[in-house]
Amino acid sequence: MEWTESIVVERPMPEVQAAIADEHQLMAWSAWPAATGYQCEVEGDGRSLGSAVVFRDSAGIEQGRQRLSAVEADRVEYRLRNNGPGGRLMTPEVDFRLEPVAASRTRVHLDFRATAPLPPGLRQVAELLLGRRVRRLHVKDLEMLKAHVEQAPIRGL
C-alpha cells in the first residue's frame, strides 16, 4: 500500500510542523484513537526522536506504537510497529511533508507506505480491504489537523 493525501492549512509552516512533531498535540487531533478504540499514551517527552505513541487495547495490551523518527522544518517522519492481519507484525511508514503556500498557509502531504505481511494474492486482497479504511482515516487525520491548527490562537499576537 502506498499513497499520498494532501491538505492546505491556513497557518504558517512552523505552527503546522509543531502540531505534527509534538506527539501530545498529535494525539489531540489524530483520528486513530476514536477509530480503533485504543488508549494512547506518549512514551518519552513526545518531542524527541525515539519518543512514541503507544496504542493499547481495553485490556491494556500493547497493539502498536508510532515512533518519532525524523523532524526537520519541512518534514516529520513516524515509523510504526503494529499488529496487522492475522496478528502479524506490520511496519508502516508515515511521513508528513510541508511546503509553504504563502506566509500564512501550508500545504501538508501525508505519505503512507506499508506492506501487509501475507503471501502474494492474499496480501493484495488484505491491502485492498485494509487500505480503504486506512486511507479514509488519513484523510480524516488531515482534516482534523487542519481544524486543530486553525482553531489555535495565532502565535505572536
Range-by-range predicted roles:
Residues 27-28, 38-87, 107, 140-157:
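Glycine-rich portal/gate segments that line the openings of hydrophobic small-molecule binding cavities
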Residues 18-32, 73, 127, 131, ...:
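Short, intrinsically disordered, mixed-charge
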Residues 17-30, 65-66, 80, 96-98, ...:
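Broad hydrophobic/π-residue packing in well-ordered secondary structure
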